[in-house]
Amino acid sequence: MLKGKIAVVTGGTRGIGYAIVKKYLENGAKVILFGSRQETVDKALASLKEENPEWEVSGACPSLTDAKEVADEIQAIHRKYGKIDILVNNAGVSDSMMTIDCNLEHFQEIINLNVNAVFNAIQPSVELMKEQGGGCIINTSSMVSKYGQPGGVAYPTSKFGVNGLTISLARELGQYGIRVNAVAPGITRTDMVAALPEEEIQPLIATIPLGRIGEPEDVANACLFLASELASYVSGEILAVDGATIC
């Protein structure tokens, strides 16, 4: 489905991001994954190469909150491959600090990591995609962007921001053949969820109409669809991947 495509995936070393990288490789894309540390990038690359030595995958670890550093990396990728077809902004942090305990510095840190960093990757990519006649951008939002969360204001605020960025860019960039969408995962079996004791997991499952916790591959499948020609007329969509938790 993605044969010959060049994809950049931020936050691609573990969890949902790693699943997206793997899914894209399985479907013929060449992938450049971004991670926060060289150690985690190397570990992810080694794991992927062990699974299939033929996969064309490489990695980098620019600071996503440094606009120049990200732009330099994006431009280097473009020089090497001649294009960037797909950008997946998956990197981000969760947060549940209560409002009464959250100072402005902490609030700004979450916004910086979850919104500003997304913009930093999008801006240079858009310039290149416009020149090449199109492209696809996928942002990772969250189900809390639809209804907020009872504990912690910074994280849902940041994901509402991702939604606004996604929808506005879809309207702005459609004329250039650039599609912009987001996925909004629900409760997903990441490392954090997997570490929970069974007595805490069961109440979570009870809130999900489909009766199970999502897997990283569920989100990766949605990202595969959005990146493929099957979604050629889909843009500005915030695609819930949450087992009907929010509908």
Task: Indicate where each model-derived feature is located.
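Active-site helix of classical SDR
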Residues: I122, S158
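Conserved glycine-rich Rossmann-like NAD(P)H-binding loop of the short-chain dehydrogenase/reductase
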Residues: N27-K43
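Substrate-binding pocket helix/loop in short-chain dehydrogenase/reductase
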Residues: M98-T99, N103-I111, V193, L204
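Alpha-helical segment proximal to the catalytic Tyr-Lys
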Residues: E127, R171-Q175, S232
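C-terminal substrate-recognition "lid" of short-chain dehydrogenase/reductases
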Residues: G134, R212-V241, I246
